[in-house]
Amino acid sequence: GCLLLWLLPSILRALDSRPRSMLCQQSPTKVSCKGVGLQKFPKELGQGIKHLELSNNFIQNLSDSYMPGFGQLEYLDMCFNQLEAMSATTLAQLPRLQSFLLGSNHLDRNFLANGEAFRVLRNIQVLDLSGNNLESHMAGWYISNLTSLRVLDLSGNKITKLLAGTFQSTPGLRELDLSNNYVMEIQAGAFEPLQELEVVNLALNSIHCISGFSLTQLRVLNLSYNALELFTSEEGAEPYLLQVLDLSHNRLLYFPELPKVHDLTHLNLSNNLIASLLPGSHRLEDFVLPYKEMGRFNRTVRPTAALTHLADLDLSNNRLELFPFTFFHSLGSLHSLSLAKNCLREVARESFTNGTEPADPSPAPAEQTELSVRSLDLHSNALRVLPRWFFDSLPQLETTDLGSNSLQPCESQGSDQGRALGGGSHVPVPGDTCTPFYNVPRLRHLSLHENNITRLHPHAFNRTPLLSLDLSGNRDLSVPRGALGELELSLQKLSLRGNQMDESRAALPCLRALRVLDLAGNRLSLLPAGLSCSPLESLDVRNNSLQTLGKLVSRSHSLREVSLAGNPFSCCSLGWLDS
């Protein structure tokens, strides 16, 4: 024992003197030295390495380093070091290098010499220069001779302007990330050499206007988190290939006009200032900055006319007060639509003439008024009623979130009367104050949380085979026994959370498919008797007035998860816990 104690200092010194590269994980062609405390390039590594990871270390330079054995290296990751200097002599020893990741270093220092050294990297296809405090001219100098470059990451720098000649030497660039900079200006012709460019990320910048957008070959464009008030595309004859466009978190006042963007499938306009979807509503005085391009706005053409392939449209978090149904008629491929968190008060079916005023409100033929939407999000608006024609015009609707509105479900006393009450009607009865959720045959998932619903009427969901129903947050809600009639064989998930219901207000029927039930945040002292025939797998009864779960738990063979906290369970009646 004494001998081991005597030898311990020598053993520890030997461990400290080991080369840091011995801590690396190595295979024949791949080596990872992430975060092992390296202060210099590990030249002692073996021959034939193609993939080398050196991120999260303390390497400061790659200058005049003799690096034998790295002639086969194709991938080098040096992100999150302290790198500030490189030499052509060193980089010339990496003739096959294709991916060079240098994010989060100090390449703003010595950028002239470093950029000159980069000229020997003739085979570089992927380059990461993110988070290096690079200004516009510095970034341009680094890539000034990289003719093979395909993917470039310049995010998280200090670029304020994209100059006309910045990308002159990188004609094969396909992906460009300029997010999280300070870009305020894009000079005319800045992207002109990039005829193969497909993906551009300009999120988190300070761009106010995109006019004459002419990158017809682009497929993905992210302009979120800017200060955009205006977005217009070039009115040329060549169609655009753009498929994904993100304009969220800007200051757009109107739906952008995209007359030639026929292939667009995903459009995100959330978190803007759009107050109207009506054609011809553009006013110069609404804009913070003056734009000469305002005169190009077409005041009669619907901006959605060309978007025949659009599948996903997000207009949430805007200022819309009206849901003009006909605005979406030309979107024949639309599957997902969100108008959540607006100021919607009503839905309107009218067509528009002269670009401004509602025309004849009489019903249009069904094939012209139906939308192909499968998922509709209208939560957090001010809707008080949805007319019968609304659901009739959405024959493919499967999922809808109508939470945080003021919608009251209508009564339907059985299938025959429910059909007579409006199954085939296109015009709501004047003075309607409730919304018919019956006879919606494709609807599977419905959320009515926080709608101030106090009572469900009998057969409210007749001929609507719901799989999930959210009625949470409707304080003092009453659910009489017949309210969930016709859902006995379909409903799998039900939430009645936070309704302050006692057992007299929760008369659930025998729901033979119910697997998930949330009853938390009520005043139940007894569980609904109808649950005895439900194959429950998950039950949440937290924060109620229950003293026992009794026979429900002891007889259930399917129950896997029960949440019980916040109930005054009696210590003398906990025998069911052993079952």
Which residues fall in each region the model found?
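A structural signal for leucine-rich repeat
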Residues: 44, 65-70, 88-94, 112-121, ...
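Ankyrin-repeat and related helical/solenoid repeat scaffolds used for protein-protein interactions
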Residues: 515-575
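Leucine-rich repeat
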Residues: 39, 60, 84, 108, ...
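LRR N-terminal entry segment and analogous cap-like coil->beta motifs
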Residues: 26-64, 70-73, 134, 284-287, ...
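Conserved LRR concave beta-strand detector
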Residues: 30, 51, 72-75, 85, ...
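Tandem repeat protein-protein interaction scaffolds
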Residues: 64, 68-74, 84, 98-101, ...
